[in-house]
């Protein structure tokens, strides 16, 4: 295994905003944490009850990723987690006054800005970076995910919307680093099909959604606050979600992840298979 110094934030930072699904205004606070704390969530700063950002605590994957433990719930964690993971922040306490992380403008930009504002502090203890030793796969209907051994963390994603010609088929392959995340992935906003709006509202979702925090795709065009940030913004946002979901493996790892049409549920399924493989390989080493 490779290793590097563990990292946390230098100072506390705060942000207030609205959750995209439940529409509640929330205060988000990120605080430095001691070595080996990991990424943990809590509803209240005075509380000693935390939800570790781990696959075992995933309780929902419908249009976002939700974590829960002992009755505490926090949803729409994926954009924040992707930012922390891509910036190599291992230890942080996250407090949110409501049960959903604020959405910002629908991208990871606000979280990247928060991390920049806080600064990053290296710590004395190290974290091991695991390397996948053999391929793992997940498939459900037309959704396919695979992770292959690699000396870098790379994602190759194919998005195919045969029912929406505005999106169509998009492909992006990228080695994930702080620099590539900052320039290529973080600015990309969440999106939905215009035809899905009634269904999502009936499900009690997108209560805080608006053109300021999401891009809507119609068959004949795009509804957006300003132009698309990239011609293939949707597939880049899918990579953003995938990074956040895979960060729940709970340790940095190297692999080439190939995804075709995946969403939160299948991302988590692959994450579990990666975790099982890494744990098995660790047992073999022992």
Curated annotation (Swiss-Prot):
EC number annotated for this UniProt entry: 3.5.1.108
Name recorded for this polypeptide: UDP-3-O-acyl-N-acetylglucosamine deacetylase
Protein family per UniProt: Belongs to the LpxC family.
GO CC annotations on file: membrane
Organism domain of life: Bacteria
One BP annotation, GO: lipid A biosynthetic process
Zinc is among the record's keywords: yes
């Amino acid at each position: 295994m490779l290793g590097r110094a563990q990292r946390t934030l230098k100072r506390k930072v705060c942000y207030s905003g609205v959750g995209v699904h439940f529409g509640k205004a929330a205060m988000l606070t990120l605080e430095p944490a001691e070595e080996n704390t990991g990424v943990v969530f809590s509803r209240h700063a005075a509380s000693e009850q935390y939800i570790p950002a781990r696959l075992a605590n995933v309780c929902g994957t419908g249009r976002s990723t939700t974590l829960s433990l002992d009755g505490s719930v926090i949803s729409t964690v994926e954009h924040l987690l992707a930012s922390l993971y891509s910036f190599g922040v291992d230890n942080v306490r996250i407090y949110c006054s409501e049960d959903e992380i604020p959405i910002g403008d629908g991208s990871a930009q606000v979280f990247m800005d928060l991390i920049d504002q806080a600064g990053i502090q290296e710590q004395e203890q190290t974290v091991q970076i695991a390397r996948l030793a053999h391929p793992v796969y997940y498939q459900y209907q037309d959704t396919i995910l695979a992770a292959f051994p690699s000396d870098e963390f790379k994602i190759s994603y194919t998005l195919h919307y045969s029912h929406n010609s505005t999106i169509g088929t998009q492909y992006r392959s990228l080695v994930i680093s702080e620099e590539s995340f900052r320039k290529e992935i973080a600015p990309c906003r969440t999106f939905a099909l215009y035809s899905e709006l009634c269904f999502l509202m009936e499900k009690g979702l997108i209560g805080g959604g608006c053109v300021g925090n999401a891009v809507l795709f119609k068959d004949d065009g795009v509804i957006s606050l300003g132009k698309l940030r990239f011609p293939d913004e949707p597939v880049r946002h899918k990579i953003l979600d995938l990074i956040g979901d895979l960060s729940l493996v709970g340790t940095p790892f190297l692999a080439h992840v190939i995804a075709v049409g995946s969403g939160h549920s299948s991302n988590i399924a692959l994450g579990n298979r990666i975790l099982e493989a890494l744990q098995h390989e660790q047992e073999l080493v022992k």
